[in-house]
A protein has these predicted regions:
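Helical scaffold of the NTase/Pol beta-like nucleotidyltransferase catalytic core
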Residues: 1-37
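Active-site nucleotide-donor binding segment shared across nucleotidyl transfer reactions
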Residues: 23-65
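Short, charged/polar surface micro-motifs in flexible loops or helix N-caps
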Residues: 57-62, 100, 111-114
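Short amphipathic alpha-helices in soluble, non-transmembrane regions
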Residues: 64-72
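Conserved catalytic core of two-metal-ion nucleotidyltransferases
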Residues: 75-112
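Catalytic cores of NTP-dependent nucleotidyl/adenyl transfer enzymes across multiple folds
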Residues: 107-183
Length: 183
């Protein structure tokens, strides 16, 4: 197994321990339908950040702050950030677990949006091969990741457009940028 796959597997193992030992999934399911983020679910983690999406059309501020209280009790974070945006509540939870810094991003969205994300994630999962997983991990390790391009770019390039080397990927990104500027 190459180094990127090995590191990603280690992160996934640590993340599973964190999620299971805290009963986090049970807590989040109390607030709506739940989806674990792509990097965690698709086993392409490159850092200690886990995204979760909770589908709930009726969430109010009292409930979201109760969720925050429950997260605080479970993790004793050193920092939490709350955002109340149009059609979205979000908690970012920063903590140290077993000597490592972790971040949980928990977004509460309308249920139909989360269900759409579930379908998209199932499609992505069906397109995965070990070779494509390696390519995704390689592109997610580059210095421009999250600054110039996102995981959505990486998944589209590798899984849909069969991009598999860095030169082709960066040319693909330039084409995407031009297409987006024209629309």
């Amino acid at each position: 197994m190459n180094e990127l796959l090995s590191y990603s597997s280690e992160l996934k193992h640590e993340a599973n321990q964190l999620v299971v030992s805290s009963n986090l999934l049970d807590l989040l399911r109390e607030y709506g339908c739940l989806l674990s983020g792509e990097s965690f679910e698709l086993n392409v983690m490159t850092n200690r950040i886990i995204n979760f999406y909770v589908g709930n059309d009726e969430m109010d501020e009292e409930s979201i702050f109760h969720m925050g209280y429950q997260l605080t009790k479970r993790f004793s974070p050193y920092k939490m950030i709350f955002a109340n945006e149009k059609d979205k509540y979000q908690w970012s939870v920063y903590m140290i677990q077993k000597g490592e810094e972790w971040k949980l991003d928990i977004s509460v969205l309308p249920e139909n949006i989360v269900k759409g994300k579930v379908k998209k994630q199932e499609l992505l999962k069906s397109l995965f091969t070990e070779k494509k997983r390696e390519c995704i991990l390689f592109f997610k390790q580059q210095s421009g990741y999250n600054r110039y391009y996102t995981s959505d770019h990486v998944y589209k390039a590798v899984l849909e457009d069969d991009i598999h080397d860095d030169m082709s990927f960066f040319m693909w990104l330039q084409r995407q940028k031009k297409v987006n500027q024209q629309t």
